[in-house]
A protein has these predicted regions:
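Flexible "arm" and connector segments at domain edges
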Residues: 1-119
Length: 119
């Protein structure tokens, strides 16, 4: 795995606000995901609904903030001894594996309905 991803994991850990308990930390970081996702949606909405130029800088900033909070959730989950991806790179590999089962040759509506990755 990439050294950068391990550095980012530790970077996020050093910048997360401790809330008291792992449960409270998890809620804080999960709410951060929701808030940043909402800010990303707002940036896209302004472009799509109101016809404003897409603020690419803002979109990139919100995506970065999402990465921070997602890594924070990973940090908390893995600190609980749960077998889970430890870095965003691990998460990316797990997601690619899941979606490769669902869409072996690429996206199709038929494959989406069949959901080969679900029993």
């Amino acid at each position: 795995m990439s050294q950068l991803m391990y550095e980012y994991r530790d970077f996020v850990a050093s910048r997360m606000k401790p809330m008291g308990t792992p449960r409270e930390d998890l809620l804080h970081m999960t709410l951060g995901v929701a808030v940043e996702a909402g800010e990303l949606v707002d940036a896209i909405k302004k472009h799509w609904v109101y016809g404003k130029p897409l603020d690419v800088g803002n979109v990139v900033e919100e995506l970065g903030d999402l990465l921070f909070y997602i890594q924070g959730v990973l940090n908390i989950v893995t600190s609980q001894g749960v077998l889970a991806p430890k870095t965003l790179e691990d998460l990316t590999v797990a997601n690619m594996n899941k979606l490769s089962k669902r869409y072996p040759t690429g996206y199709s509506d038929q494959a989406a309905i069949a959901r080969a990755d679900k029993d």
